[in-house]
């Protein structure tokens, strides 16, 4: 499984697929479809972001009862201009999308093949979306898979300080706010008093949002203004502008409180607040503990339950599928940068983790309650 995943990761990374490029999405979908098991059903599902290319669903059936969902995404962050073909460097495979998350997609394909011949399997489906990196619509796929026994998501993996393999069973909720300010433009030299600065209003809004950050509090809220754009000329009071803020907390309710705290007018400028995207929180520590214990015993080494602040589509499925485990991809680094990489050795260790989880899931009824 690992050796095949190494070859397939390289083939996937060789295709540039930045989020929102429909032509590139069709190219990467074509590559993945060619790697699907011979007897698999291949479907296209409408993407949550309607202007993006349709998502890809690959399914295999068996005579048993267990239903397993495998999840990943095909879109990446790095633009075509910054893209380069994958390169090997010492023990790494370097290239845009290696860790986030084409290495994980390759392992997910291996997991689908491993499930194909299991007598306990009723259905295994691999869902690969085209808008995870930037989504403007409401996530569309949760209800379709609500009757599945388990969801395994193949975002990048990690190890503990002691070197043990870790998986992700807890994630923060995440949201992005867009604030649009409307002030009044005026000549900054001859009549600045006639203007209402959208820039100053947004700067004040940014300070307000940042002041609500409470990472040590009960919701572990982080509220971070990240992008401010305002002004068109050096001699004009800015009449408009936009501010983007990244919010993370244990629940969406904490994010909604921040959103509600922003006034509709600041320093004379009107403020419009829009939530551009949102992921629910995920906490599957209790539900996944028996499965992780059973898989660790089969593997002969610990699989550690971990948590992560970054958003993932696993969180959407954790609402409906109690056994949801994320972070099953290879270990790596520099995500969202051109020099992103994976540790090639981790393809082997993570393959072992995935296969142990599948064995425990299919053979041990107690592992899924």
Q: What are these model-predicted stretches?
A:
Residues 75-79, 92-107, 187, 313:
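Glycine/serine-rich anion-binding loops at beta->alpha junctions
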């Amino acid at each position: 499984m690992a050796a095949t995943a190494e070859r397939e990761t390289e083939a996937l990374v060789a295709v540039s697929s930045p989020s929102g490029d429909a032509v590139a999405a069709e190219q990467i979908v074509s590559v993945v479809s060619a790697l699907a098991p011979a007897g698999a059903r291949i479907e296209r599902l409408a993407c949550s972001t309607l202007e993006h290319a349709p998502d890809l669903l690959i399914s295999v059936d068996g005579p048993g009862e267990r239903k397993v969902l495998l999840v990943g995404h095909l879109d990446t962050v790095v633009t075509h201009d910054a893209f380069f073909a994958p390169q090997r460097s010492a023990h790494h495979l370097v290239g845009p999308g290696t860790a986030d998350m084409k290495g994980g997609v390759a392992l997910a394909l291996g997991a689908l093949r491993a499930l194909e011949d299991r007598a306990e399997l009723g259905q295994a489906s691999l869902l690969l979306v085209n808008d995870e990196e930037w989504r403007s619509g409401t996530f569309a796929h949760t209800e379709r898979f609500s009757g599945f026994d388990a969801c395994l998501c193949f975002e990048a993996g990690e190890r503990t300080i002691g070197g043990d393999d870790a998986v992700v069973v807890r994630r923060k909720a995440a949201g992005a706010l867009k604030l649009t300010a409307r002030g009044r433009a005026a000549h900054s030299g001859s009549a600045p008093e006639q203007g209402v600065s959208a820039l100053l209003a947004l700067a004040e809004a940014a300070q307000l949002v940042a002041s609500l950050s409470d990472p040590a509090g009960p919701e572990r809220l982080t509220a971070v203004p990240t992008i401010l754009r305002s002004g068109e000329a050096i001699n004009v009071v800015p009449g408009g502008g936009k501010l983007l803020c990244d919010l993370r907390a244990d629940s969406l309710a904490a994010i909604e409180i921040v959103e509600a705290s922003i006034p509709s007018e600041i320093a004379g400028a009107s403020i419009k607040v829009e939530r551009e995207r949102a992921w629910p929180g995920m906490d599957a520590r209790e539900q996944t503990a028996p499965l992780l214990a059973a898989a660790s015993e089969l593997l002969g080494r610990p699989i550690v339950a971990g948590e992560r602040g970054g958003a993932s589509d696993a969180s959407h499925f954790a609402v409906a599928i109690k056994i949801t485990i994320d972070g099953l991809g290879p270990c790596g680094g520099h995500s969202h940068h051109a020099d992103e990489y994976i540790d090639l050795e981790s393809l082997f260790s993570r393959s072992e983790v995935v296969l142990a989880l599948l064995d425990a899931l299919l053979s041990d009824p107690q592992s899924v309650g």
